[in-house]
């Protein structure tokens, strides 16, 4: 095979046998027995082969469903604590995709139902992270929707079918892939009924949205405009069957623990009164573990909606020790992320133990759980990240408790010199 660049052989102009471009229109023309191929067609062939290999790998990995123990083990690498929730999720997700792998087999008279999941836990306890990690592990399309932005059809706001549109966007509008995806609906507690008594007044963002979501979650054929276009009568829609999409709903459900305590301590004098005082002394997480479907109905979810979320998993409120673990142990721990950023500048970043404790305490005071850790560290390290790229002689930065509390600035250690601390800010 020969490489023809200018190809003035016999004064004849040469062309690519595949795309028809001349040798002057491409960078390189490769000659074979009576044929030529240009560099652009070679690149195109490589892309086609690469896509086919990736699709084959994705199909083979889809058939290799990890066991519940394996799923839980991978979740352990990213989510600290919440062992019960991880176990519940691992079993539910395993059974869901096992059901999908069985659905096309003939001769099986038992029809397996879908088990959607409801996650209940305080803000920043890991609900969204659990759902994200599951989708990444299973290599399926995943999208997050905020229930507070949803309204009934015909009202200003997001239509519930927009959720399916977002899922389609995640997989380049491949309907087959989307129908195997996972949807996480956050803040589901915010669309609860304002009271547990049915009302004749219109509740645009509450019960009405629950009714609309009900159809989507239990299984319907949603009509979605192609490539994100607006709906109009003459348009052809993509038809997406939601029967096999796994829906995971999550919410903090603030006040639900009181509903549970009222149920478990209803009435009572004498000895019962003593039991009631013990119930009231329970932590929120302990109370939430005793949740029953009737409690959710009392909270404001309609019975039909609760019935479509048969798998309940509760998450505990994170304490100081758990927050410190979150800062240091997971694969994507924040201290590891910031250390990597500093490493790119040739600088070591060290967090002292007292600094980690101080960060955890501040997050607890803000009641933001793990979600607030990044904003705390970002604020503490902002000035340092601003200065470091301009100071090539700095080899190490040390963060201690006084830095987190704003009493002093980080300790800078310079190459071939003694450690020096920046001057403390003016009081």
UniProtKB/Swiss-Prot annotation:
The keyword Heme does not apply. SMART domains: AAA (SM00382), ClpB_D2-small (SM01086), zf-C4_ClpX (SM00994). Disulfide bonds: none annotated. Pfam families: AAA_2, ClpB_D2-small, zf-C4_ClpX. InterPro entries: AAA+_ATPase, ATP-dep_Clp_protease_ClpX, ATPase_AAA_core, Clp_ATPase_C, Clp_protease_ATP-bd_su_ClpX, ClpX_bact, P-loop_NTPase, Znf_CppX_C4. One of its GO terms (biological process) is cell division. The keyword Mitochondrion does not apply. One of its GO terms (cellular component) is HslUV protease complex. ATP binds at residues 122-129. Residues 4-57 form the ClpX-type ZB domain. CDD domains: RecA-like_ClpX (cd19497). Zn(2+) binds at residues 16, 19, 38, 41. One of its GO terms (molecular function) is ATP binding. Keywords: ATP-binding, Chaperone, Metal-binding, Nucleotide-binding, Zinc. NCBIfam families: clpX, PRK05342.1. ATP-dependent specificity component of the Clp protease. It directs the protease to specific substrates. Can perform chaperone functions in the absence of ClpP. Component of the ClpX-ClpP complex. Forms a hexameric ring that, in the presence of ATP, binds to fourteen ClpP subunits assembled into a disk-like structure with a central cavity, resembling the structure of eukaryotic proteasomes. Belongs to the ClpX chaperone family. This is ATP-dependent Clp protease ATP-binding subunit ClpX.
